[in-house]
Curated annotation (Swiss-Prot):
Function according to Swiss-Prot or TrEMBL: Involved in GDP-mannose biosynthesis which serves as the activated sugar nucleotide precursor for mannose residues in cell surface polysaccharides. This enzyme participates in synthesis of the LPS O antigen.
Family listed: Belongs to the mannose-6-phosphate isomerase type 2 family.
Pfam families: ManC_GMP_beta-helix, MannoseP_isomer, NTP_transferase
InterPro entries linked: EF_Hand_1_Ca_BS, GMPP_N, Man1P_GuaTrfase/Man6P_Isoase, Man6P_isomerase-2_C, ManC/GMP-like_b-helix, Mannose-6P_isomerase_type2, NTP_transferase_dom, Nucleotide-diphossugar_trans
EC number in record: 2.7.7.13
MF (Gene Ontology): GTP binding; mannose-1-phosphate guanylyltransferase (GTP) activity
Record's protein name: Mannose-1-phosphate guanylyltransferase
Organism in which the protein naturally occurs: Salmonella montevideo
Pathway: Nucleotide-sugar biosynthesis; GDP-alpha-D-mannose biosynthesis; GDP-alpha-D-mannose from alpha-D-mannose 1-phosphate (GTP route): step 1/1
Gene3D superfamilies registered for this protein in UniProt: Jelly Rolls, Spore Coat Polysaccharide Biosynthesis Protein SpsA, Chain A
Amino acid sequence: MITPIIMAGGNGSRLWPLSRTLYPKQFLCLDGSQSMLQTTITRINNLNASDPIVICNEQHRFIVAEQLKELSKSSGDIILEPVGRNTAPAVALAALKCLKKNALLLVLAADHIIKDEETFCKTIQDARKYAEAGKLVTFGIVPTMPETGYGYIRRGQALFSAENDCSLAFRVAEFVEKPNLETAQSYLDSGEYYWNSGMFLFRADRYIEELKIRPDIYKACSLAMESAVTDLDFIRVDEDSFCACPDESIDYAVMEKTNDAVVVPLNAGWSDVGSWSSLWEISDKDSNGNVTKGDVLSHNADNCYLHAETGLVTAVGVKDLIVVQTKDAVLVANTNCVQDVKKIVEKIKLENRHEHITHREVYRPWGKYDSIDFGERYQVKRITVKPGEGISEQQHYHRAEHWIIVAGTAKITIKGEVKILTENESVYIPVGVKHCLENPGKIALELIEVRSGAYLGEDDIVRFSDKYGRN
């Protein structure tokens, strides 16, 4: 049986301001009602595959668990990377976990869009016989334009199956770096090159066998998995061992070295959604070529991407623009300059701002909060707690809190005294007092929190107990 390995790391900074460090693009709903991670998992339902193994950053663990839960998928196989070490070590962790099962690993990125899912699944099935025979299969995207933003794979000798004389796969002749425009055009004209998708299919044992040509990676990952511990839904690998691992991609560490690399062409409407212009290209457009999301009005606007998260966005007499509005930031960019969005993100970092890290609305394992106003000595939040969930037992040294219940029922414990509050009731929590909040009801609990004090940072917290295992 195929075991999907979903690579859910990365921060997608080219899609700022929607994509942030703590809520990157793979968790966003960009092309429908599901997040990109959820769409990636749903896409392989017809493959009769096992539940996926998701590899993600420590900071994203609760987002991944919640999105898997929404799909009714098991969340028991979420491998947490203490640091990012690229794709070769990440896949090694999953392969080591699956080694005894002799699993066939389908390695997928969580942030790709594939329009023709039927063709995608058929191509996976066609490639299966090569992977089962011990080949390391990579999927090459049939190019549609001389793209300079992707690496390429040059195909070599055709491989013919016993069933027919029509080749479905080729030996990999070479992997090539991102070309200039002239070279990319020559690749397109030759018909021998494919875009490097970063998707793979191989047996777990074959990957580990080939990885041993890099004993530094193999040893570090083996030690990391040998000392791994299970925490709630998560597999925490040993931090010291994994941090010692080199940062290396699968292509460099394995695929360029092996004699068994095979490329299977894939023509299924693939996109890695690497920029706002690529998202515009794959999205439905109006008669003027505009893509609109949210509350948007336009007049004499052409070929624009207009996104309104809150409030009204209007565009008049403009063309070839990207306009993305969120609760705390607005991006306006020419479609020809979208690769430079990363430079704006770097400027935000240099100015020690926070807009590249988190949205105004922040998700937690118990629910979410929205910072709706703040000043020098106060902050106002709208807090939503899911049924059956609650915040940790905690105290703060520098701030007091006022909670006003807007909807639902709150079970509040202050200095050991339990109170049940409902709509239009409130409570005051003094500085330094131990307290906790739970939602015992069947509907979401909504409240307004007003903080006041000399220091209002999220790190002013001492947790005494926490059901989510946070420090």
